[in-house]
Amino acid sequence: AVNTAMQAIDKIRDSSTSHERCSIIEVMGRNAGYIALWCGIASGAEDILIPERFDGNRPKLENELIESILEKKALGKKHHLIINAEGVGHSYGMAKRIEQATGVETRASILGHMQRGGNPTAKDRVYASTMGAMAVDLLCQGKTNRVVGYKNGQFIDFDIEEALAMKKTIPAYQYDVAKTLAL
């Protein structure tokens, strides 16, 4: 999903740059902001909006974005890229408010299910083959209710109930890196 989204983001960014616009690109991520975070870092987005960092206060968020755009505009920045996870949402409303408040032409693009398409990377294919083989091996050993995954450089298996209870959090350092790269 990230690679497919990046293809679209690169094209939108080119247009945003040449027309001196602000672009809000909404990517998948209803409950988790990993796709938005990775796309934001990879694209050098000025702002990345993820559910894990959104407190539900939309006016406050929009004011922060407006301030960010105006600050960067004062420094000579001619375009602005915002990657927005769908869990934060309201991209069209944000675009309208930003344009009204800053005078910067602002467009929202929602990538939606397009991100689910595309060819898997070589890494995706190797991981899928390895995990599939491991799952078959586990079944041949009489082990059921197992989940196969990849962690710390190794393919592993664990109980399905344990897997369902796991919570994956956004690394604070990675989010901070994204903010630093956007300067």
Predicted regions and their residues:
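Short glycine/threonine-rich loop-to-helix capping motif typified by GTGT followed
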Residues: 93-96, 120-126, 158-166
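Short, hydrophobic alpha-helical segments
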Residues: 9-13, 136-143
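Accessory alpha-helical/coil subdomains and C-terminal extensions
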Residues: 1-105
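Catalytic, metal-anchored helix/loop core of enzyme active sites in primary metabolism
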Residues: 97, 114-129, 136-140
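Short, amphipathic alpha-helical "lid/cap" segments that border enzyme active or binding sites
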Residues: 2, 62, 128-136
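Generic long, charged, amphipathic alpha-helical segments
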Residues: 107-109
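Phosphate-binding loop/pocket of nucleotide- and phosphate-handling active sites
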Residues: 146-183
